[in-house]
């Protein structure tokens, strides 16, 4: 099984070239051409020694289960050892259905819960 790892975005060199070429800089205000740094950047990256690594690095994994998880690509519970879930946060009380609701949902005819009209209770401090 081969694993392909993208080391950097494929458009990073082009984006950096365009960004440095079209964005004005403080050097441009002082009399330096704004594309000077861009040309230096591109000329440095044309030298083979300074070229970034290839876009995709092949890494052959014969048995993935025998390899420990990589810190660059954390998976599972080892992703962040500082984050620990407490059992109290995972527990929820069981849902219970009242007998009145169970009886009303089993019948097909609509059932009224109360015969009295319901009026909302308003506190006195909110009354004008």
From Swiss-Prot:
Keywords: Cytoplasm, Nucleus. The keyword Cytoplasm applies. Residues 101-114 have a biased composition (Low complexity). Residues 62-83, 101-128 are annotated as: Disordered. One of its GO terms (cellular component) is cytoplasm. It is found in: Cytoplasm; Nucleus. The keyword Cytoplasm applies. Present with 300 molecules/cell in log phase SD medium. This is Uncharacterized protein YER084W.
């Amino acid at each position: 099984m081969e694993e392909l790892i993208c080391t950097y975005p494929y458009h990073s060199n082009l984006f950096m070239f365009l960004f440095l070429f079209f964005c004005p800089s403080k050097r441009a205000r002082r009399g330096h051409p704004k594309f000077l740094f861009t040309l230096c950047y591109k000329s440095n990256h044309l030298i083979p020694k300074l070229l970034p690594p290839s876009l995709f690095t092949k890494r052959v994994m014969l048995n993935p289960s025998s390899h420990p998880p990589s810190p660059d690509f954390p998976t599972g519970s080892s992703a962040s050892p500082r984050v620990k879930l407490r059992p109290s946060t995972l527990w929820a009380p069981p849902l219970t259905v009242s007998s009145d609701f169970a009886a009303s949902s089993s019948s097909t005819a609509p059932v009224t819960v109360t015969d009295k009209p319901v009026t909302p209770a308003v506190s006195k401090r909110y009354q004008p």
